[in-house]
Amino acid sequence: MTDSEKSATIKVTDASFATDVLSSNKPVLVDFWATWCGPCKMVAPVLEEIATERATDLTVAKLDVDTNPETARNFQVVSIPTLILFKDGQPVKRIVGAKGKAALLRELSDVVPNLN
């Protein structure tokens, strides 16, 4: 991605997690990932699509577990990619492993209406 391209996802860190995720008015899907993780790279474009298409219903955030180990540890993330959906500051759904767009939307739709 070049500097001129704007990502639809937001980058969160250990320092910004409480503000960007836990205090959000919208549900936030956090992608716990790492630069060296092949499956993480496969799911990244799917998450960008969801972030763009469902921006009114959902925020998609990315947290690099190598540079932000505290948050990953706090939520017991042991495998990546792990996606955790937060609603009203609480984790309400955990999805481990790379999944396609339709499967992700289906899994999230029971918590976030309007995703199907």
Swiss-Prot record:
Alphabetized Pfam families for the sequence: Thioredoxin
GO molecular function annotations of the record: disulfide oxidoreductase activity; electron transfer activity; glutathione disulfide oxidoreductase activity; protein-disulfide reductase activity
GO terms under cellular component: cytoplasm; cytosol; extracellular region; peptidoglycan-based cell wall; plasma membrane
Domain Thioredoxin: 2-113
GO biological process, one term: cell redox homeostasis
Disulphide bridges, residue numbers: C37-C40
Keywords annotated in UniProt: Disulfide bond, Electron transport, Redox-active center, Transport
Stated family: Belongs to the thioredoxin family.
Protein purpose: Participates in various redox reactions through the reversible oxidation of its active center dithiol to a disulfide and catalyzes dithiol-disulfide exchange reactions.
NCBIfam families: thioredoxin
Protein name, entry field: Thioredoxin
Species this chain originates from: Mycobacterium tuberculosis (strain ATCC 25618 / H37Rv)
Gene name of the encoded protein: trxA
